[in-house]
Amino acid sequence: MTLVCGRVNFFSGPHLVFKYWLRGKFMRIIIVGCGKVGSSIASELNLEGHEISVVDINHGAVDKLANSLDVLGIEGNGATYDVLIEAGAEYADLLIAATARDEINLYSCLMAKAAGVTHTIARVRNPEYTNDLYRIKEHLGLSMAINPEQTAANEISRLLRFSGALEIDSFSKGVVELIKVTVPQ
């Protein structure tokens, strides 16, 4: 017998929202940062058929990504207005700032909003900044700020809490969890 039960979680995280935004919708997306994270995001979104522009100050990283994926590569500082305009910010639906520096990511999102980008997502790893994420999101107009280490820790903790679960689904931005377990007869 299989039992499905629900649980409300009052600590909501951003980890699933990103996927729901993109599902079944063509978007023009700018990714600032061509490191491991930025490259992985570009690769995934490229497979889904989105129009991608990547921006990085490292010529080699931009060139490698532009030659391996169907993306527009721009060499330059993704925190500057002119470079974002060159990458297509005036028509972009989403900017994802995934450089190694939180300050660059936040400033890139601020400049992207000024250039007309609809939604912005910043990778923010510094715990001092993550404590103020709600204020940062409100004042900078961020759609989402993600701390990958914190998100991974939360996900591991969630899986350990329900180690016998066959399936765990989150709804309502992580506030509600639906858990599927097998109950012995």
Regions found by a protein language model. Name each.
Residues M1-L3, R7-N9, P14-Q185:
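Cytosolic regulatory regions of ion transport systems
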